Every structure is written in C-alpha cells, then in structure tokens.
Amino acid sequence: KEGYLVELGTGCKYECFKLGDNDYCLRECKAKYGKGAGGYCYAFGCWCTHLYEQAVVWPLKNKTCK
C-alpha cells in the first residue's frame, strides 16, 4: 500500500516543497509507518510507500483539511 502521509488531527497532508527524493518525507514516513516504509515528495505532499494494508493515509473519511 502507498499514499499521502496525513495529519490525523486536521485531515491535512504533510506538505513538502522539494519534489522527488526528500529527507523530511522519508523521515516522517518511517516515523509513522515503521523503518520498512519509504517516502518522497510528490505534488507537494509527502507520499509514503511500502505501507502495511491497514495504514491510514489521506484522505480521511469525515475529515477535510481546512
């Protein structure tokens, strides 16, 4: 599974500005989903890869980013 890293409190994606390989996104994806996860910046949001199937990613049901 893969998807955008989401802030559970707000429903917003984690923003990033350096597209492609991005240390911030990689670090945040690993912190949230475990050391096996990967991450990079895609369309100004942190995109996480190699996630477990139950991982929560953006968009959240019933919670829109404001």
Curated annotation (Swiss-Prot):
Keywords for this entry?
A: Disulfide bond, Ion channel impairing toxin, Neurotoxin, Secreted, Toxin, Voltage-gated sodium channel impairing toxin
MF GO annotations: sodium channel inhibitor activity; toxin activity
Record keyword Secreted present: yes
Pfam families for this protein = Toxin_3 (PF00537)
Please tell me whether the keyword Acyltransferase is annotated for this protein: no
- Intracellular or extracellular location(s): Secreted
- Choose one Gene Ontology CC annotation of this protein and give it: extracellular region
Where is it made, tissue-wise? Expressed by the venom gland.
| Cystine residue pairs | 12-65, 16-41, 25-46, 29-48
GO terms (BP aspect) = defense response
LCN-type CS-alpha/beta domain segment(s): 1-66
**Free-text comment on this protein's domains from its UniProt entry:** Has the structural arrangement of an alpha-helix connected to antiparallel beta-sheets by disulfide bonds (CS-alpha/beta).
Please state which protein family the record places this protein in: Belongs to the long (4 C-C) scorpion toxin superfamily. Sodium channel inhibitor family. Beta subfamily.
What further note is attached to this protein's record? Answer: Is neutralized by the single-chain antibody variable fragment 10FG2. Abundance in venom is approximately 6.2%.
The record describes the protein's role as: Beta toxins bind voltage-independently at site-4 of sodium channels (Nav) and shift the voltage of activation toward more negative potentials thereby affecting sodium channel activation and promoting spontaneous and repetitive firing. Acts on human sodium channel Nav1.6/SCN8A. Also able to weakly shift the activation curves of human Nav1.2/SCN2A and Nav1.4/SCN4A.
Record-given protein name: Beta-toxin Chui4
Q: Which organism is it from?
A: Centruroides huichol (Scorpion)
